[in-house]
Swiss-Prot record:
Family statement: Belongs to the Casparian strip membrane proteins (CASP) family.
TM regions (residue ranges): 38-58, 88-108, 121-141, 174-194
Organism of origin: Populus trichocarpa (Western balsam poplar)
Assembly mode: Homodimer and heterodimers.
Protein name: Casparian strip membrane protein 2
Keywords per UniProt: Cell membrane, Cell wall biogenesis/degradation, Glycoprotein, Membrane, Transmembrane, Transmembrane helix
Record's GO cellular component terms: Casparian strip; plasma membrane
Subcellular location, record wording: Cell membrane
Main location, first listed in the record: membrane
């Protein structure tokens, strides 16, 4: 007579190691790591804006041309300080460039602490003010440069750029540089808005 084999389930002893779960979860990577990349790009754009703003102010501020012919009583000369609009342009672009230089430490703080909202909020407010000043100066100077190139027959304003070519070329370059600075400011404001998002 054969004995039937029986299986007996034995409980595992306490010495057998079971799978253990860690009591403290591993720290997850903090969300919003893209904010540091935005802050670095913001810093680079500010350096570019400093260059364009200084170029605009320097180009306009050094625009001076004297025609080689003159009479006994008249000397034909054109300079930026002959027009208050161009004087305003030089002063405004110098202020914008100075502000951009002073904003660099705040941009560095935003790189070191990308989740800090205070410096970013301050920059977005001051950038808006600087953008307004920059746009006003560029638009005013652009109107005068347009008249210098084309004149206005209704008011008998003659185009002077045929005679003062170098003067008009420098002024036109300054206006273009100022509007490049405007575009950079718009990008800075968009970046700051993205950086202030909570999610």
């Amino acid at each position: 007579m054969m004995r039937g084999s029986t299986e007996i389930d034995m409980p595992e002893s306490s010495s057998v190691s079971k799978g253990t779960a860690p009591l403290i979860a591993a720290p997850m990577k903090e969300k919003g790591g893209y904010k540091k990349g935005i802050a670095i790009f913001d810093f680079i754009l500010r350096l570019a804006a400093i260059a364009t703003a200084l170029a605009a102010a320097a180009s306009m501020g050094t625009s001076d041309e004297t025609l080689p012919f003159f009479t006994q009583f008249f000397q034909f000369q054109a300079s930026y300080d002959d027009l208050p609009t161009f004087q305003f342009f030089v002063i405004a672009m110098a202020i914008v460039a100075g502000y951009l230089v002073l904003s660099l430490p705040f941009s560095i703080v935003a790189i070191v602490r990308p989740h800090a909202a205070g410096p970013r909020l301050l920059l977005i407010i001051l950038d808006t003010v600087a953008l307004t000043l920059n746009t006003a100066a560029g638009a005013a100077a652009a109107a005068i440069v347009y008249l210098a190139h084309n004149g206005n027959s209704s008011t008998n304003w003659l185009a002077i750029c045929q005679q003062f070519g170098d003067f008009c070329q420098k002024n036109s370059g300054a206006v273009v540089a100022s509007f490049i600075t405007v575009v950079i400011f718009v990008f800075l404001l968009v970046l700051s808005a993205f950086a202030l998002r909570r999610h």
